Amino acid sequence: MDSAPVVIKYGGHAMTVPELGRAFAEDMSGLVHEGGRFIVVHGGGPQISALLKRLSIESHFVDGLRVTDDATMEAVEMVLAGQVNKAVVGLFEGYGLSCCGISGRDGGLLKAVVE
């Protein structure tokens, strides 16, 4: 039986350094070609903050966590599901990896409840 895939987080700050992205993709390519299976989840904090600034939407944080009103959530989804997701897929494909990018919203994959 195959082992379960390993989940790896690729942070938004790491994405701002092109050399780190290339090294990460190269390492992932080597591991996949050796038979490894992975799910990569990505961040995007700096990218979100940059778009919010361009849109003149003020970021609010409580205990280090971003508070997301409707306008902020729309911007977050644009950045994560659009810009960042596509960039990560493109990076990996450039290193010969077959991959796809999905959002937790796609097909109701993930649902959250506010407590």
Sequence positions of predicted segments:
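Nucleotide/pyrophosphate-binding catalytic subdomain
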Residues: M1-E115
